[in-house]
Amino acid sequence: MIGTAAYRIEVPKTHWNGKLAVYAHGYAGDGNKLAVQNPLLRRYLLDNGYAWAASSYSKNFYDVQAGVEDTNALTLAFNNIAARNGRPLAVPTRTYLFGISMGGHITAAAIEAEAQATTRSKAHYDGALPMCGVLGDTELFDHFAAYQLAAQQLAGLPASTFPDPNWRAIAPDVRTALFNSTTSFATPTAQGARLKSIVMNLTGGARPIFDEGFANDGLQKVVWDGFGRTGDINGILVNNTSVVDTRRIRYRFDAPDAVVDTFNASIKRIVADTNANPLRSDGVRWIPKINGEFNIPVLTLHTLGDMYVPYMMEQVYLQRATAKGNAGHLVQRAIRAPGHCDFTVAEQATAFTDLAKWVETGTKPAGDDVLTASVLAQPRYGCSYTDNTVGVDDTATVKTWRAKGKLPACN
C-alpha cells in the first residue's frame, strides 16, 4: 500500500527493457471498495519487455485529484518497491503514462504544467496515451447538462431550474415524447430526431458510427441515468458548488433558422459557481484542469460513437493545445466503434508502439484531423487506425461489435 491506495507492479523476469508503463484505470463507481485493475495491454507490455504499474487510487467516485496524486506517488515509488521485494532495478530509462476514460483524464492532467507545479508527488513522464479520455475536464459535465436540457425542451417539459428537482418524476414522460420505445433509443419520434441532431452536433458533428452510438441502448441508459444530478460531481466539489455551465452552448438541429434561434433563446442556461474548482495549496485541483500546456509526446485514441465521453473531447483538447502553442506535441486517432473505450487490444498496442517510437526516435506518427467538419463527415473517416482484429485479451463487447457486418465497413 502507498497510503490507502493499493498497487500492482509486474516486471519481466528476464528481458526487462528498462522502461516503465504506468496505467490509470477508469471510473470505478461510488463505493468504498478499492481495487487495482490490470490494463488490457498487460500481455503486450510484458511480451515487449515493459514493466507496468497501476494504482487502485485512494478513493473511488470521479476523483481525478486522487488519481493523479496516487498514480504519481506510485511512479516515484517504483524502484523502492522493487528493491523491497528483492529485485533492485535501475531507474527506468523511459516512463509512459496511459489510461482510459477517467484514467484518460488523469493521464492528460498529470502531464499538464499546472498539475506538474501543484502535485504533491512530482513524477516525470516521457510520453502519454490517454484513451477515451475526459480531455475537456469539466466540459463533459456541461455536455451532460445540455443534453438533458435539450431533451426536456423538446419534450415540452422545459427546465426552469438546475438541477431540476422534478427530473425523476418527469423522465418517463420525456422518454415517451422523444422515443417510440421506453427501452430503446433506436427509433426516435419527430422531436426525438431533433434531439438526435442536437446530440450529434454537441458530440462532435456529423461522422461515421454516430448513428450506432446514439442507438447504443446500454450506454445511452448510463448517460440518462446520470441526468438530474447536481453540478458538484457527486460530492467531489465542496459546499454544494457547481462547475456546470451551458451559456456558451449553441444547440443546432435540422429546422429553419428561426426555429433554432427560438429554441436557443428559450432554453434554460446554467451558470457555474465562480470558485467551484479552485487551485489548492495541498495538491492538484479536485477536478484537475487540462489547459493544453504539455511538452511531451501525446497520442490519443477515441471511438466515434461514444455517448458517455463523446468524441468532441478530442476537439476541445486540440483547440486548447493549439491555443497554447502545443499542438505539435499531439497526435489523435479516431476509431470506428459505437461504445465507450471499446478499442481492440491491437489498436491500443499499435498506439503504444507508435508513441514509444515517437519518444525514442523523434519521428512523429500520423493521426486524424479531428476538427474539419467535411473530413469527419466522410464515410471512411476513422478507417486509418481501426483494427478489427480481436484476440484472447479483448472483451466480449469488443468481439461482438467488431464481428464482420456489425458496423459500416471500410472498403
Which residue stretches match the model-derived regions?
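Short beta-strand/loop motif that positions the catalytic acidic residue
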Residues: 294, 299-302, 306
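Short beta-strand element of the alpha/beta-hydrolase
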Residues: 17-28, 96
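Alpha/beta-hydrolase-fold serine-hydrolase catalytic core, especially in secreted/extracellular enzymes
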Residues: 198-245, 336-411
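Accessory cap/linker subdomain of secreted extracellular hydrolases
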Residues: 121, 131-288
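Conserved alpha/beta-hydrolase "acid-adjacent" motif
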Residues: 307-313
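Gly/Ser-rich "nucleophile elbow"/oxyanion-hole loop immediately N-terminal to the catalytic nucleophile
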Residues: 14-16, 73-101, 123
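Short glycine-enriched nucleophile-adjacent loop
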Residues: 104-119
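Gly/Ala-rich beta-loop-alpha elbow adjacent to hydrolase catalytic centers
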Residues: 98-107, 128
